[in-house]
A protein has these predicted regions:
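Mature exported/compartmentalized surface modules and terminal targeting/interaction regions
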Residues: 126-129
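GNAT-family acyltransferases
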Residues: 1-120, 131, 135-153
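Conserved polymerase palm-domain catalytic core
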Residues: 123
């Protein structure tokens, strides 16, 4: 990986994205139980989501392992190495899914983005992809973005 910073030092990282359908906020340890419930109820659905080609994630980790993973994502966010957002229902604050924004392995000025929604909220996958795609284009300083396209059924 090159030595360029993922985002410029003076860039103010967005703390949220709000739409009528969902709200994004930085993922952290405080989301552990709800995050764990969201992805463990949707493993096959997530594995069939564009951007998860190897079918190995999510794995069978424990809730304690999930907490460590959320801590790592929060640390990455704090140190600007990557940005993971939880996707929340704006009315109930239930976790709908996640969005991961990390540097491309070959060019850290480019972002590789993945997202998922829980199976029970599958209808939000395309609206989430559309909103995040526009947000990345208009509010982030990346030289380019790789984010697997969503096609309506």
């Amino acid at each position: 990986m090159d030595s360029a910073p993922f985002v410029p030092p003076d860039f103010v990282v967005p703390s949220s994205l709000e739409t009528p359908l969902f709200r994004l906020e930085p993922l952290g340890p405080q989301h552990n139980e709800a995050d764990y419930a969201a992805w463990t109820s949707s493993i096959e659905h997530i594995r069939n989501t564009p951007g998860y080609p190897d079918g190995n994630w999510p794995d069978g980790r424990s809730i304690a392992d999930n907490l460590r993973d959320l801590g790592r994502h929060a640390d990455d966010f704090e140190h600007r190495r990557g940005f993971t957002y939880t996707v929340l229902d704006p009315g109930t604050a239930d976790i709908i899914g996640c969005v991961y924004i990390y540097p491309d392995a070959d060019d850290s000025r480019r972002a590789v983005v993945q997202s998922w929604v829980r199976a029970s909220r599958a209808e939000l996958d395309i609206p989430l992809w559309r909103a995040v795609s526009v947000w990345l284009e208009t509010s982030w300083p990346f030289a380019g973005v790789t984010y697997d396209d969503r096609q309506p059924d």
